[in-house]
Amino acid sequence: MDNLTKVREYLKSYSRLDQAVGEIDEIEAQRAEKSNYELFQEDGVEEHTRPSYFQAADDSDTESEPEIEDNQGLYVPDPEAEQVEGFIQGPLDDYADDDVDVVFTSDWKQPELESDEHGKTLRLTLPEGLSGEQKSQWLSTIKAVVQSAKHWNLAECTFEASGEGVIIKKRQITPDVYKVTPVMNTHPSQSEAVSDVWSLSKTSMTFQPKKASLQPLTVSLDELFSSRGEFISVGGNGRMSHKEAILLGLRYKKLYNQARVKYSL
């Protein structure tokens, strides 16, 4: 207490007391504006490196915004979506499916057979929507069917639809031009001795009936074909025997099935 009393008495007689108080107030005002960290530095406290989590927080604050902008175009999977084993989810398609118009053929017509003073005409309507290559294939198919009529009677053929197309069959096909093997007899007949069977076009061949009540069937190539060209066009050839040519004519005229029932062909 004595010391404190002495200090008070001394301050009363201190001539620069007001100046000292003002300096103290100014120092206190400056200290109030500074952070505790800065005060520690002024007081000589040793500066330590800032903890790593402060640095990480600062880095994340400065880099988070550009990183979000850079990843805006990337696909972010939904964390709440149900995960399926083996399934890797990727970005969804960013385009919409194009609308495709489907048009069903409505103007197609059944084949029509027309007759006039010039003859007969069969009209086949081309299917709609075919490409150039498909149209060519369709026309080639029709042409092949027409050409095949030279080697068999289409009216006697069977028509079968399959998964790959159409199958046309006939049990007994007329002899092929390049595969005919003449039957050689011990005593060759006149028809086998000639070089061209059409030279016997006016010669008749007789087939005996299976029943006594019927008359024998006598027929010639001239009666079955109008010309040698017609005979060749349906599969005939000069190397055929006379009987083979006659049987070909009966098939061509659609008389073969009826004749083989009544006569020994």
Swiss-Prot record:
The modification Phosphoserine is found at S60, S64, S226, S227, S233. Belongs to the vesiculovirus protein P family. The modification Phosphothreonine is found at T62. The modification Phosphotyrosine is found at Y14. Residues 245-265 are annotated as: Interaction with the Nucleoprotein-RNA and template-binding. InterPro entries: P-protein-C_vesiculovirus (IPR048220), Phosphoprotein_C_viral (IPR043036), Phosphoprotein_central (IPR037263). The gene is P. This is Phosphoprotein. Transmembrane segments: none annotated. Pfam families: Phosphoprotein. It comes from the Viruses. It is found in: Virion; Host cytoplasm. SUPFAM superfamilies: Phosphoprotein oligomerization domain-like. It comes from Vesicular stomatitis Indiana virus (strain Glasgow).
